[in-house]
């Protein structure tokens, strides 16, 4: 297998998280079981098989591999991918792809779909993604992937199968939708992204940026530029209901040993063993 970029993996329950994220370098994630990826700052070779991607914002470390991904799928005779982008980015992205097509003398077949806060992206009968507003220096979004199931309404649960069938035949809606948050994704954002989107804190797995950790950094400046500090996690530690919390997008000024030391000083139990540092 070709390994052109770093990829780390974590499996929890029935979901696999794969990817890499370092601030100003590149960010890319995918969940193979959901056939879904987040952000296209880089494109590991085997990630091209994932047909649907959602881009949180348009800084280059989150979108630079857009033409590479589309071109590879065309070259390998795969179906055109579906890519969700901030709606203001659709026009510029189309222009960029046209110019890369001219340079490469090839087509760039894909479906680009604009998103805004409040949207619901239907991936399948079982999966839907809700879009929330993040806070960054460019328009940015966060996402929750929900599993959808239909269950018999409470008032009909004691009825026989024949009676339920008759109700259905008479046009009565006997079931209702239940949603279960599987994965939350917060790309670049100040802590307002968490505060405004509490469903992120309920997802089975949360992937969140944690760009800054050093005690001496000024949090107000960090927040102004749309990022988070370790203190922001510590202040919200009682709010996390997630089974796993993946912290990533660390600043390149830090050595991995420094990151682990600062986290262990402030969160010695790693939030009950649920916190994973993507180093």
Predicted regions and their residues:
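Active-site metal-binding loops of divalent metal-dependent hydrolases
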Residues: 58, 88, 187-189, 210-211, ...
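Binuclear metal-ion centers of metallo-dependent hydrolases, dominated by the metallo-beta-lactamase
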Residues: 107, 111-119, 192-279
């Amino acid at each position: 297998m070709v390994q052109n970029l770093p990829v780390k993996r974590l499996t929890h329950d029935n979901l696999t998280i794969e990817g890499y994220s370092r601030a100003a370098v590149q960010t890319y994630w995918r969940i193979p079981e959901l056939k879904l990826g987040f952000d296209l700052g880089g494109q590991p070779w085997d990630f091209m098989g994932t047909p649907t991607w959602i881009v949180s914002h348009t800084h280059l470390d989150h979108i630079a591999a857009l033409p590479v991904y589309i071109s590879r799928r065309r070259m390998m005779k795969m179906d055109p991918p579906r890519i969700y982008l901030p709606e203001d980015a659709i026009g510029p992205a189309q222009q960029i792809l046209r110019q890369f097509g001219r340079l490469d003398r090839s087509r760039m077949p894909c479906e680009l779909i604009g998103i805004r806060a409040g949207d619901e992206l239907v991936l399948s009968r079982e999966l839907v993604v809700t879009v929330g507003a993040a806070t960054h220096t460019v328009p940015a979004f966060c996402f929750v992937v929900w599993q959808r199931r239909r269950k018999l309404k409470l008032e009909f649960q004691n009825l026989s199968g024949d009676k339920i069938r008759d109700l259905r035949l008479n046009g009565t809606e006997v079931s209702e939708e239940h949603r279960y948050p599987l994965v939350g994704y917060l790309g670049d954002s100040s802590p307002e992204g968490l505060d405004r989107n509490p469903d992120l804190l309920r997802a089975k797995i949360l992937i969140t940026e944690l760009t800054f950790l050093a005690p001496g950094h000024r949090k107000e400046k960090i927040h102004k530029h749309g990022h988070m500090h370790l203190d922001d996690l510590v202040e919200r530690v009682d709010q996390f209901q997630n089974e796993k919390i993946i912290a990533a997008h660390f600043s390149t000024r830090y050595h991995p040993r420094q990151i682990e030391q600062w986290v262990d000083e402030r969160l010695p139990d790693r939030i009950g063993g649920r916190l994973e540092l993507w180093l």
